């Protein structure tokens, strides 16, 4: 007689062990985005896929993310909060238009950031705050027309900065002075205007020529009174000598405000003095009359 034995179901401990083994095999967040290639446990390659946004999901512990050649318009605000292990981000040739405040929160390990060939037009104060370990930052071939003097604050480890081929006409030297480890900076390919606002940057460039990989010949500027561009090598500190006697817009505001304040103070003082004199004149005749009355009584 054959006995029919019911199949055994795994005990709770066995099921938990099996699930644990599966998780170990899969690892933390091992999902690879559709159409991308995860060439190793810490690299995700999504280049030239026509993606409209940052792919999701992908391994949470990714260290190298390649998304160049897509149509991505923004970096999610919480992106680095979930992917804090990221060291290398290639974001070239996308449609990025702006960097929102807090975009790089949680990017404490990021060392290489390539944002070249995007549509950035402005960099605000603290644009890269929290990315203090950045070593190389490329912003080349964007449409940058303005860089805040505090745009690179906290980037104390930055060694390479690429600002070439943008629309910069001027740049506050304070933005560069905030980078103590800077070794290489690209400033060529911009429509610099050699006016008095450029004088401070010219002095900085003269003192840091060794940091310019293409030298002074590659950087050109337009002369305000002439319809031509010249290489910085053709200029000298003497070219900006007249700027020592010129006043900036801030200086003019201070002078105007001081003049108005002095004028108001003078008017108030004159009014007060006139009032005192008038009161004195009114009181003086009465005193003279009293003196005459006293003389008559005598």
From Swiss-Prot:
User: What are the leading ranks of the lineage?
Assistant: Eukaryota, Metazoa, Chordata, Craniata, Vertebrata
Its assembly, as annotated, is: Interacts with KCNMA1.
Q: What does the UniProt keyword field contain?
A: Cell membrane, Disulfide bond, Glycoprotein, Ion channel, Ion transport, Leucine-rich repeat, Membrane, Repeat, Signal, Transmembrane, Transmembrane helix, Transport
Topology check: give the Cytoplasmic ranges. Answer: 273-298
Domain description: The transmembrane domain is necessary for interaction with KCNMA1.
The subcellular location is: Cell membrane
The protein here is known as: Leucine-rich repeat-containing protein 38
Sugar-modified residues: 119
SUPFAM superfamilies noted in UniProt: L domain-like
LRRNT domain location is 32-60
A Pfam family assignment: LRR_8
Q: Please give the superkingdom of this protein's source.
A: Eukaryota
Name the principal localization, coarsely classed: membrane
GO molecular function, one example?
Answer: potassium channel activator activity
Membrane-protein topology: Single-pass type I membrane protein
The answer to whether keyword Magnesium applies is no
LRR repeat segments: 61-82, 85-106, 109-130, 133-154, 157-177
Which ranges does the record list as Extracellular topological domains? 32-251
Residue span of the signal peptide, if any?
1-31
